[in-house]
């Protein structure tokens, strides 16, 4: 990852009123922290929080799991899932904002400069009953540009916006006194 050159960003106005951002970053990846925070500076985003990620690849995470360790998930998936639940919980308990952006530390905001809309325009276009809006996908085929209901092949935890109501549902289902219950479907 390279550090951004910080020339004047003439498109930063497009992200005015963006909700608080919670980005997930492994403690052992300081260059990704620098990368993300240089992007936030470039885009004039000040309302962000780093969430220390759980590394399921190398660490035994059984001490943060409540119930049966999920056998249908890889250790990396357990680390990813619990890190996202940790980020959601942190936002839910420390902020009164109606919604938040949760993102991983390899998101590239560069495409925002090509938007022909602002964040405010984007928010006005959302269905009134949204719970989660996926803002980045892993796509092995065509990319759908318009807002659409979830498709089976669109998956990613790279970046999404979540509202308080849905966060509360997820936490009630998966969080038990600082531990994460994943044997009930994650």
Residue spans of the language-model regions?
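An acidic/histidine-cluster motif and surrounding catalytic segment
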Residues: 1-103, 107-186
């Amino acid at each position: 990852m390279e550090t951004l050159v910080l020339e004047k960003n003439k498109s930063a106005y497009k992200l005015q009123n963006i909700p608080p951002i919670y980005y997930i970053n492994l403690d052992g990846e300081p260059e990704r922290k620098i990368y993300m925070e240089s992007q936030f500076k470039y885009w004039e985003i000040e309302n962000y929080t780093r969430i220390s990620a759980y590394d399921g690849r190398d660490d035994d995470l059984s001490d943060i799991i409540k119930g049966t360790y999920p056998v249908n998930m890889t250790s990396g998936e357990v680390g990813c899932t619990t890190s996202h639940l940790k980020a959601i919980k942190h936002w839910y308990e420390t902020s009164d904002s109606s919604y938040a952006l949760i993102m991983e530390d390899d998101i590239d905001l560069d495409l925002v400069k090509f938007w022909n809309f602002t964040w405010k325009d984007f928010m006005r276009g959302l269905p009134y009953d949204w719970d989660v809006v996926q803002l980045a996908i892993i796509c092995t085929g065509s990319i759908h540009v318009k807002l659409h209901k979830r498709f089976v092949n669109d998956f990613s935890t790279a970046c999404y916006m979540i509202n308080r109501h849905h966060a509360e549902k997820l936490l009630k289902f998966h969080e038990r006194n600082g531990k994460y219950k994943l044997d009930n479907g994650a």
